[in-house]
Amino acid sequence: MSTGSLSDVEDLQEVEMLECDGLKMDSNKEFVTSNESTEESSNCENGSPQKGRGGLGKRRKAPTKKSPLSGVSQEGKQVQRNAANARERARMRVLSKAFSRLKTTLPWVPPDTKLSKLDTLRLASSYIAHLRQILANDKYENGYIHPVNLTWPFMVAGKPESDLKEVVTASRLCGTTAS
């Protein structure tokens, strides 16, 4: 990997000199002897590397190949990748099960209906809004406060405390303890 330092230039010059001596670098970044008498050997006799095609006078850069990762680090990366893939599959499995449970709880959706996740969420949201509306219309009927209408710490949502006290006393009077 090139860092742009002086040692990179020196390494490149060393490679060129070794190529002139009949050694070539193979794909594993190891030098091997060349039995062929090619253009490199003729260039070495001239004392300069081959110029670009057409005599433009520009020297081509040798393609730099990344050194292969050691077997240990490749195995470690593969293990990490497999673990991450397994975690993602488990997460998606849990998410899919949650969406299928949500779809089956919606009352007006037939079980064989295919719904996208977005459609499932939209239907669930509209169902929740529908239930809220029913509870809002039926909030104080018969002096009974539905637990959904209670907020922490058990106050009727949207009602002043004075109205709450009236509802609580009315529910006590209407309960089974009144005689």
Swiss-Prot record:
The keyword Protein biosynthesis does not apply. It comes from the Eukaryota. Residues 70-80 have a biased composition (Polar residues). SUPFAM superfamilies: HLH, helix-loop-helix DNA-binding domain (SSF47459). The keyword Transcription regulation applies. Residues 79-131 form the bHLH domain. Disulfide bonds: none annotated. Residues 33-46 have a biased composition (Low complexity). It is found in: Nucleus. InterPro entries: bHLH_dom (IPR011598), E-box_TF_Regulators (IPR050283), HLH_DNA-bd_sf (IPR036638). One of its GO terms (cellular component) is nucleoplasm. Keywords: DNA-binding, Nucleus, Transcription, Transcription regulation. Residues 20-87 are annotated as: Disordered. GO terms for biological process: branching involved in ureteric bud morphogenesis; branchiomeric skeletal muscle development; bronchiole development; developmental process; diaphragm development; embryonic digestive tract morphogenesis; epithelial cell differentiation; gland development. Its main location: nucleus. GO terms for molecular function: bHLH transcription factor binding; DNA-binding transcription activator activity, RNA polymerase II-specific; DNA-binding transcription factor activity, RNA polymerase II-specific; DNA-binding transcription repressor activity, RNA polymerase II-specific; E-box binding; histone deacetylase binding; nuclear androgen receptor binding; protein dimerization activity. Efficient DNA binding requires dimerization with another bHLH protein. Forms a heterodimer with TCF3 and binds the E box (5'-CANNTG-3'). Involved in epithelial-mesenchymal interactions in kidney and lung morphogenesis that include epithelial differentiation and branching morphogenesis. May play a role in the specification or differentiation of one or more subsets of epicardial cell types. This is Transcription factor 21. It comes from Homo sapiens (Human). The lineage of its organism: Eukaryota, Metazoa, Chordata, Craniata, Vertebrata.
